């Protein structure tokens, strides 16, 4: 799906569910990571996450488009367009738009675990972040630390 197709799809969804035209731009933004889409208040454009289309297909994308169009049409009309506003929640129910999008399948990265051991007292430290062993010492005996293992 390219930029022209997504623009056409957003315009069709706007006319079908809201009976109002969408007069601005709809584009894919590859930098979006944790959200399905966003409505830009200043430009009135809608940005969508292409990975949601790849993972879940057009049906999920239409749901995200309906959600963003709720923000769009309420903001244009001067009504409450934020997630907590009553107007927004009512319009979501009316057009059967999702309040939240599905979680990304491969969203979570593998967590690395670093293990260090004191050379003096053999106390072991387990950390999620790597530490500078030249700068930091054991909190118990002030001995030097050595890395034991790094697991992911």
Curated annotation (Swiss-Prot):
Keywords: Cytoplasm, Metal-binding, Zinc. One of its GO terms (biological process) is response to stress. SMART domains: SprT. GO terms for molecular function: zinc ion binding. It comes from the Bacteria. Binds 1 zinc ion. Its cofactor is Zn(2+). Its main location: cytoplasm. The active site is at 68. GO terms for cellular component: cytoplasm. Residues 7-147 form the SprT-like domain. Pfam families: SprT-like, Zn_ribbon_SprT. NCBIfam families: PRK04351.1. Belongs to the SprT family. This is Protein SprT-like.
């Amino acid at each position: 799906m390219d930029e022209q197709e997504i623009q056409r799809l957003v315009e069709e969804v706007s006319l079908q569910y809201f009976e109002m035209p969408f007069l601005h731009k709809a584009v894919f933004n590859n930098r979006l990571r944790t959200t399905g889409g966003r409505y830009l208040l200043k430009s009135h454009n809608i940005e969508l996450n292409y990975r949601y289309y790849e993972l879940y297909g057009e049906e999920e994308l239409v749901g995200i488009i309906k959600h963003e169009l709720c923000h769009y049409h309420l903001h244009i009309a001067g009504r409450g367009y934020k997630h907590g506003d009553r107007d927004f929640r009512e319009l979501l129910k009316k057009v059967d738009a999702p309040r939240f999008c599905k979680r990304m399948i491969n969203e979570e990265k593998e967590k690395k675990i670093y293990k260090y051991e004191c050379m003096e007292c053999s106390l072991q430290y387990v950390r999620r972040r790597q530490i500078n062993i030249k700068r930091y010492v054991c909190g118990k005996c002030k001995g030097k630390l050595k890395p034991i293992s790094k697991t992911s």
